[in-house]
Amino acid sequence: MWSLAQAGDHIVAQKTIYGGSYNLLEHTLTQFGVTTTFVNAHDLAEVENAIQPNTKAVYLETLGNPNSDIPDIDAIAAIAHKHGLPLVIDNTFGTPYLIRPIEHGADIVVHSATKFIGGHGTTLGGIIVDSGKFDWKASGKFGNIADPNPSYHGVSFADAAGPAAFVTYIRAILLRDTGATISPFNAFLLLQGTETLSLRIERHVENTKKVVEFLANHPQVEKVNHPSLPDHPDHALYEKYFPNGGASIFTFNIKGGREEAFKFIDNLKIFSLLANVADVKSLVIHPASTTHSQLNEQELAEQQIYQNTIRLSIGTEHIDDIIADLEAGFAAVRGE
């Protein structure tokens, strides 16, 4: 976003996104003069009406964090392109194995490689994928990429790098100035993780289907927020964009409140209490007090995060062990 928006610019972003991304857009970037309008991505009119003359990008997640809600990527891409804007999509939860957003109109795709790509929660890293399809000159809005750059002897990145203009600009300018470069060993670990990505994702998806079914039929569960369920508002979008399954990070609301949620979490043995996700190990967290703790009560409610909301990241352990562990948590809440 730092490479797209400068002081005085504006971003349109999906409201239900990772707490860290929300705070980057809502608080950190405002210190640099960049503002963000957060929208209900399911309301296409709201998305389009939020676009201003100084808007530089539309930002989505293929699967929202933590509830795995799904935007209509094709439709929002059409809106962004109508206004000469790039569509930026965080595909961390979707993974390149399950969905390829560029095929649905995305111009830039980002991943937290720490998650599914690395797969083991051992390495911090990120990936930016430039589709090479966006015309940085057409709208006249992206002078930092299209116009001559004085720090590189008047070179225009759009002219010099062609389809790779955006990522070349990031490598030459942003990484130069921030030093955000991973070590060779961390790069090795991430490359090693990609070798087993398909195998791991298949197991994640298989286990998730069974856990969702277990929770949906459990008497101590108030609600399961998973798009594979027929009554989920994004079920049709799930079938469209994720025909091979997905959303192994999702939430459910336990009957009760914060106390019941904490007791459930504290009595799990296989699930690790960690803010990380997309690990081969099953993970659990209480979003309202951790990953999204910087949001106020109204902001939490807008993202459908409550004090009884629990986020699960389903790992690759044997499904019988996973379900037995969850049942032990429910038993503890019952006082057994």
What are these regions (language model features)?
Residues T178-T181, F185-A187, Q192, T196, ...:
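Conserved small-domain helix->loop->beta segment predominantly found in fold-type I
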Residues V129, T251-N253, S313-G315:
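Short hydrophobic/aromatic beta-strand micro-patches
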Residues L63, T92-G94, L229, K255, ...:
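Active-site beta-loop-alpha junctions enriched in small/polar residues
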Residues K133-F134, E195, D231, K255-G257, ...:
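Short, glycine-/Ser/Thr-/acidic-enriched flexible segments
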